[in-house]
Amino acid sequence: MAIEFAVQRLGIGDVVLVGLPDQDKAVEATVVRDIDRTETTVRATLRVEGREDFVKEWPLGELVTVVRGP
């Protein structure tokens, strides 16, 4: 069961849905490192199976869809 919550609540091990440029639909990505939080943004290193890890940045308050937790 997926749930939406503010990006500030993300933690290591959470699996979120993200859009990728070469994909038509959202894919599951796992938060794999400590999250960098600033006054205006949240940055997380994500892992998608079969790809290199990448960093995704969201503005504070944006909602993300979490598929499952750690």
Go through the PLM ranges and name each one.
Residues A6, A29-T30, V55-L60:
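Short amphipathic beta-strand/extended segments with alternating polar/hydrophobic composition
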